[in-house]
A protein has these predicted regions:
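Glycine-aromatic micro-motifs
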Residues: 1-205
């Protein structure tokens, strides 16, 4: 069995939330359960990752309610610091997770081809482009994002149900609450849409 790292940068940084995609459960704050993977074994490992692509929020409505969800842009930058958590899962599990994120069945991925191209659109779903981010401990790192680059679609602030899940994930990466707020306030889709005091109240009451 071949394994790859799946790098998450949105709600899947929260390990409890990501396990719903593996095991077929409903995440707290979500309106519907996930289908789950054919192989429900937990990740072999997980660890933080710094992704050098910009994080932003877009789209209008999802299982998290009205509001945007997280994507990364297509242009790498040394000064871009998107926090993430990556999970060591099988290639089959990665394909199953990507299928669920795109609302389809049976997405087939040629991982070698993606390594060559770095960005490869495979479906018209919200997360239809698979991205190769490099290697760690001899295994390739992949994630997925929109087929559209940052700025090609309008920025939309996310729901607090969604942001709470992201905040929990950021806290597990070692951020304190002020660091979580400072991090999120810089991101397109939050910057200029949600003020700091409202963000604090929405996340923690």
């Amino acid at each position: 069995m071949n394994y790859v790292w799946y790098a998450s940068y949105g709600s899947n940084m929260n390990q409890d939330r990501f396990s719903c995609y593996i095991e077929g459960k409903q995440a707290e704050g979500s309106s519907e359960p996930e289908r789950g993977c054919r192989n429900c074994d937990p990740p072999l490992a997980d660890q933080p990752i710094n992704i050098q692509y910009p994080l932003y929020f877009s789209k209008q409505e999802s299982k998290w309610g009205t509001g945007g969800v997280a994507f990364i842009g297509h242009r790498e930058g040394e000064n871009e610091k998107t926090a993430g958590r990556m999970y060591l899962i099988s290639e089959e599990q990665f394909m199953d997770v990507a299928s669920q994120e795109n609302g389809i069945d049976g997405l087939e991925i040629d991982f070698a081809r993606i390594k060559e191209s770095r960005f490869l659109p495979l479906t018209e779903g919200w997360y239809g482009t698979i991205v190769y981010l490099g290697d760690c401990e001899g295994k390739p790192i992949f994630t997925f994002t929109s087929n559209h680059d940052m700025g090609e679609e309008e920025f939309v602030p996310p729901s607090f149900a969604y942001l709470k899940t992201i905040a929990k994930g950021l806290e597990t990466l070692g951020m304190d609450r002020q660091e979580v707020v400072d991090y999120l306030l810089e991101k397109n889709g939050i910057n200029g849409f949600i003020k700091g005091d409202l963000l604090v109240k929405g996340l923690w009451g």
